[in-house]
Amino acid sequence: MVSALRRAPLIRVHSSPVSSPSVSGPQRLVSCLSSQSSALSQSGGGSTSAAGIEARSRALRRRWCPAGIMLLALVCLLSCLLPSSEAKLYGRCELARVLHDFGLDGYRGYSLADWVCLAYFTSGFNAAALDYEADGSTNNGIFQINSRRWCSNLTPNVPNVCQMYCSDLLNPNLKDTVICAMKITQEPQGLGYWEAWRHHCQGKDLTEWVDGCDF
């Protein structure tokens, strides 16, 4: 019986190495489970003791299913099961109505069209937009508000003028985003703080940004 087990072509069944970069974590998990089942069926099933089967199973798990791969597969599985937050992509008039309701039309002398134009050229109307700068700071939300001064990414010794976490600026209801944007426009630069507004919106006819929108 021992000699028969030694002749079992276990290695030939699993010709693809586990470390292959083209195989994902979940696929490796499936390969691990199928390899164990195949090897056990080749060993003769009922002619092998339960203790022997268990020992072989443990050996196969150690050989073909390293702990790191098992953990990766588990993380992938959990990420599929847990609910994910959906990014909110606003329409032009939809965003104009929301910003109008928050009181941005005419705030600090800027029209509603200024704000809609700004949102388009900073984030493309994406409330969950997140961009990383070379210095490690982040631009957050529909107005791409930066973490160097206005919000907190838990980086020590960094101002947090808006007194909120940067993740709050990714909320699709835009309340925190509008509060922070109002504080920014209270600065001497106003909307000029945003380079996108200076290049694409300032001094231009912006009526098209709110044209046809009902409030």
Curated annotation (Swiss-Prot):
Coiled coil (residue ranges): none
UniProt xrefs under PROSITE patterns: GLYCOSYL_HYDROL_F22_1, GLYCOSYL_HYDROL_F22_2
PTM annotation, UniProt: The processed form derives from the membrane form by proteolytic processing.
Single GO BP term: fusion of sperm to egg plasma membrane involved in single fertilization
InterPro entries: Glyco_hydro_22, Glyco_hydro_22_CS, Glyco_hydro_22_lys, Lysozyme-like_dom_sf
Annotated site, Cleavage, chain positions: 87-88
UniProt GO MF annotations: lysozyme activity
Keyword list, A-Z: Cytoplasmic vesicle, Disulfide bond, Membrane, Signal-anchor, Transmembrane, Transmembrane helix
Extracellular domain ranges by topology: 85-215
UniProt record similarity statement: Belongs to the glycosyl hydrolase 22 family.
Function: Sperm surface membrane protein that may be involved in sperm-egg plasma membrane adhesion and fusion during fertilization. It could be a potential receptor for the egg oligosaccharide residue N-acetylglucosamine, which is present in the extracellular matrix over the egg plasma membrane. The processed form has no detectable bacteriolytic activity in vitro.
Protein name as annotated: Sperm acrosome membrane-associated protein 3
Source organism (scientific name): Pan troglodytes (Chimpanzee)
Gene for this chain: SPACA3
